[in-house]
Amino acid sequence: MFSFSEFYKLIAQHETLRPWLNTLPKQLSDWEEAEHGDMGRWIRALKKFPTDKPDIIDIKNEVSVRYEDGIANGEQKRLESLLRLLHPWRKGPYNMHGIHIDTEWRSDWKWDRVLPHISPLQGRSVLDVGCGNGYHMWRMLGEGAALTVGIDPSNLFLIQFEAIRRLMGDDNRAFLLPLGIEQLPELKAFDTVFSMGVLYHRRSPLDHIIQLKNQLRKDGEVILETLVIEGDENAVLVPTGRYAQMHNVYFFPSAKALKVWMEKCGFVDVRIVDESVTTTDEQRSTDWMTNNSLPEYLSPDDPTKTIEGYPAPKRAILVARNPD
């Protein structure tokens, strides 16, 4: 189905990543043998994507590719039809040969909030946990990262990532693996680890924070972004049912409480660098994601609350160092 051989070759050359070869090939082999629903249809579409390298690639300011002389109108329409087969597009935006993929999330806005507060990524190996379709991985490469590895169990995200990677000319500095972080050994290998939009989906948030720490080298940096509430170091919300129509959510600490959690798990120099209310300009339905989105999840009578009556989504970004 997929060949991960290039990734195996790459990590075999890294002393700290090489031990991953003891478990990873079997895990990915098991994944390939499992049933995957729409995967066959998506793979047939994926095989039709061009792989020739575009003349102009911009992953510093956005994620876009184009040829100097443009693309024929018929070829552009064919490419757009292929991309639309991979609906819904949640993370982006992308501009592929003049085709603007207007995704549900303005993930570039999140990146603009994160970037000023982190250590330079130049030459770093980066792990992006819950990476979605890999949008931020391209932006990390745009900042000079040597290698970005994303993990996300969603098959559609994997296919979308591979489609974009093909349109990038098969860039082999970014890899997405269909795994969850609980499937990773304690690698202690990455210079920077990102976890954005994952923590509130975890039944045991402290275990997740420790799992992030176990992937970092000594003095490596973690960037943790998650939904939070207002309050002091003891404030935490545990929704009794759904939150903004999400059913698989568990813990919403205050940013101050999350800082305490990270320190409890052994991180140092923990900083709260941003807190932002998610707006309906940042998350909304589009032509490329036609399902319900944030506007439908907020109370029609009070947009400061979800339709269940909880505080509307607010996100915090924390940055910390692994001293071990």
From Swiss-Prot:
It comes from the Bacteria. Its EC number is 2.5.1.-. It is an enzyme of class 2 (transferase). Pfam families: Methyltransf_9. CDD domains: AdoMet_MTases. GO terms for molecular function: methyltransferase activity; transferase activity, transferring alkyl or aryl (other than methyl) groups. It catalyses: carboxy-S-adenosyl-L-methionine + 5-hydroxyuridine(34) in tRNA = 5-carboxymethoxyuridine(34) in tRNA + S-adenosyl-L-homocysteine + H(+). GO terms for biological process: tRNA wobble uridine modification. Keywords: Transferase, tRNA processing. Carboxy-S-adenosyl-L-methionine binds at residues 91, 105, 110, 130, 152-154, 181-182, 196, 200, 315. Belongs to the class I-like SAM-binding methyltransferase superfamily. CmoB family. PANTHER family: METHYLTRANSFERASE, TRNA U34 CARBOXYMETHYLTRANSFERASE. Catalyzes carboxymethyl transfer from carboxy-S-adenosyl-L-methionine (Cx-SAM) to 5-hydroxyuridine (ho5U) to form 5-carboxymethoxyuridine (cmo5U) at position 34 in tRNAs. Homotetramer. This is tRNA U34 carboxymethyltransferase. It comes from Photobacterium profundum (strain SS9). The gene is cmoB.
